[in-house]
Amino acid sequence: MEKYKFLTVPGLGSSGPAHWQSLWENQNPKNFHRVEQISWDLPICHQWIEKLDEEVQKLTEPTYLIAHSLGSLTVVHWANKYTSAMIKGAFLIAPPDVENSKRLSFIEGFSPIPTFKLPFKSLIIASTTDQYATIERANEFAHAWGSEFINIGKKGHINASSNLGNWKEGQDLLNDFINT
């Protein structure tokens, strides 16, 4: 991972200090940069995609997007509106089903979820015990977006609550994704 640049796109509430995204950023500060949203707790889609685009416009080297949860949908909505030759791929972890989740009814503008082939390679990693999307729905997203799909089993929402720590499995999957 040290020879590539990464832009992390956290989801609702951002990624706290025990989240694998934060741990990866702290271990590789020269290679990782986080998109900072205006409001992490009251997400508005057009604001989130504009903040992502601001960061993408600053890129000077080819970069991979590493998105978690609502950050994954931010990437998809961004790609539906913008493009950049600097984006080499998107690593999309636990995209939520905002169209069918009552837990996420307060978020604004993320529904409907775009259904088009992303203009860069992408990988969705999902869990069979994610409370924000069924494994079947995550697989539907992969088909719609032209993404590879990996089911990693019972890992919850693949966040700090999943007790993944540095998420070595995720690092290995990212390295495999980059090298294909």
Give, region by region, the residue ranges found by the protein language model.
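Catalytic histidine-centered segment of alpha/beta-hydrolase-like enzymes
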Residues: P43-H46, K155-N166
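Catalytic active-site module of serine/aspartate enzymes centered on a nucleophile-bearing elbow/loop
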Residues: K58, N163-T180
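Gly/Ala-rich beta-loop-alpha elbow adjacent to hydrolase catalytic centers
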Residues: L65-V76
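Active-site catalytic motif of lipid deacylating hydrolases and related acyltransferases
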Residues: E2-E61
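Short beta-strand/loop motif that positions the catalytic acidic residue
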Residues: L118, L123-A126, D130
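Conserved alpha/beta-hydrolase "acid-adjacent" motif
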Residues: P17, Q131-R137
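Active-site nucleophile loop of the alpha/beta-hydrolase fold
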Residues: G11, E36-W40, A90-N100
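Catalytic histidine neighborhood in serine/cysteine hydrolases
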Residues: N31-H33, H143-N159
